[in-house]
Amino acid sequence: MKKSLLTLSLLSSLSLYGCGGSSDYSGGRGDMPNGELTLSITDAAVDNASEVWVQFSAIEIKPESGPSITHVFDTPMRINLLSLQGSLSQDFFNNLSVPSGVYNWVRLAVDTDGVADSYIIMNDGMHELTIPSGSKSGLKISNGFIVGANSQTAVTIDFDLRKSVVMSSGQYKLKPVLRLVNNDEAGALNGSIDAALTTGANCSDQDPKTGNAVYVFAGHDASVDDIDKISPDPVTTALMSLNVQTGNYDYEVGFLPAGNYTVAYTCMADLDDPEVDDAILFQSVTNAAVDAPVELAGADFNR
């Protein structure tokens, strides 16, 4: 079975934890007491997929000083990332006792052995997911975070599928674009889109179920563009769903660091290839401000 963390890396880590287990750090690192860490995952969805399952076998975190710490799951966690949109998330572990202090990065071990451990379900059926660089290096998030002494810290990984799922040589590949957010420093953004905008002349098609998404860019009055790994790229994106009571389409973006944002709506998101500079049109653009923690900001799009 292929894993995105080498066995050697796991064995050389400072300590191994089983799922639901507790740590050995009764006295913390040096004279510092422990803190409790909760690590979760959320997702920004992608068009034309009904399910995206990724199987995680371990989590590795790296203190600023000293060797890394690895949490190995007794049973690998297989998660449908498409079920974690908006402000929804799933814990990898909850209130795990770890040494307090600064941590430099997080690495995810993902199973991709080609036997339906990690896969995507598209309109034409199920396809295995491969991770080009994951067999040796894992999925690494270089954002740092701090675990406070004798306190609880919660951070969430945004696994942005719209930026991460690419088709290459007939295979679906994960080239993950991951960001790490401290929950206490993050809020959420929601709004609605007039149904008439979802079937306009500039849309990719006349089906309101495809291509409709909001892209969120850092700062007010920011330039907006497609996803192509060239600035400006959105911080994150969100799909929308029909509100049967209003007849409009609603969206929610969770785990956004507090600050100012430019929110852009497009009905051409299904044409956005993250590997290519596409001519995506944005039908409406507005500014929004997000407060923390977990304060909902609004940004609506009307005809």
Residue spans of the language-model regions?
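Hydrophobic helical h-region of N-terminal Sec-dependent signal peptides
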Residues: 6, 10-12
